[in-house]
Amino acid sequence: MVKAAAKSRKSRILIADDNAPNVELLEAFLTDVECEIAVAVDGRDTLEKVTAFKPDLILLDVMMPKMSGFEVCRKLKQDAATKDIMILMVTALNELGDIERAVEAGTDGFLSKPVNKLDMLKHIEVMLRLRHVTDELERLRRYIQEMEDGSGPEGDGPKEPKK
């Protein structure tokens, strides 16, 4: 079973695929993952759901109406507010050129359909762990910066290192 690294809330996974049977299969694969799931049915819907749902990870199909997965990925990775969302492209496209386009767009991972359940779950586990560790590292970095600036909980200025 894949468990989210963060204890404060369940991980959020957005499935972005316009094919209902594919969505159902991915949802079935995720039944043992402790997560909240949302579904987007096209590229524009994906961008809207990202804003509202704030996913930790997106399972992103490439060939969707209104905007391709490549374009969605590129937009998300170029935006400071969404660049840290993990993106796993799940697609029937599996030529070397397709993988290169996915990497150029900024994807964090790539799986070809038909998807192997264990392979997908391992990718998700690693990506969620990385996302949560990165979030915790950023939280600690901000805390240290506040302490150094004297704006932390003690509020008495920067500390001199002990000798």
Predicted regions and their residues:
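Non-catalytic signal-transmission and effector/linker regions of two-component phosphorelay proteins
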Residues: M1-L14, E27, R131, D135, ...
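Two-component/phosphorelay signaling modules centered on CheY-like receiver
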Residues: A20-V41
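Receiver (REC) domain active-site loop signature in two-component systems and cognate sites
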Residues: M64, I87
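C-terminal output helix
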Residues: V115-L128
